[in-house]
From Swiss-Prot:
Gene3D superfamilies: Uracil-DNA glycosylase-like domain. Keywords: Cytoplasm, DNA damage, DNA repair, Hydrolase. This is Uracil-DNA glycosylase. InterPro entries: UDG_fam1, Ura-DNA_Glyclase_AS, Uracil-DNA_glycosylase-like, Uracil-DNA_glycosylase-like_sf. It is found in: Cytoplasm. GO terms for biological process: base-excision repair, AP site formation via deaminated base removal.
Amino acid sequence: MIMADLERIKIEPSWKEVLKEEFTKPYFDSIRESYLQAKSSGAILYPPAPLLFNAFNLTPFDQVKAVILGQDPYHAPHQAMGLCFSVPKGVALPASLRNVYKELERDLGIPPAKHGDLTSWAKQGVFMLNAILSVEQGKAGSHQKFGWQTFTDAAISALSRKKKGVVFLLWGNFAREKRVLIDSTKHTILESAHPSPLAGNRYFGNGHFSKTNEILKVQGEREILWRLPE
């Protein structure tokens, strides 16, 4: 039972400290109850429970340099791994991720990776957060009323409040709505259309990968190696 109480929540220590008050609020109890009720009903939930907080565990609070925001996890088998847009090696690339790779190649000349595992980005300080952290198999958005967004909004607000110089990549209208949580006098906000094919070609040409590195370089920080290891 991954969310039984604060002591048993499997989340990276720096994030656990930053968000400790959230875990004690009534809404988090509601998330826990909704999640456990869905699980006990026999529904298949994604990502697997140990990966619910994967974005937090792979990118400690004090190491966050950039943020990519997604909406909710992939809802087909074997796809969701707790990082927005990312899928495990061996899983077919979703259409949105294929477009991310196309823009990466256009922007920086990096050929598309043969896999969709973005763990390397997360380990370099790219916080790859879905606003909603769980979903039922085959039912996109099925957990949007659980209260996850209150929790993930708190994470975004904490980054804005406690850090400076973070680059926020907001792709699509859903992500763009989160800009109200971000202090643009302390951080950089890069916006564009979503990489989904439904957005047409409006995502292409945003140059967000090179722009992120330019900003980090000016700030004296190590640039992100966007090329994924095979």
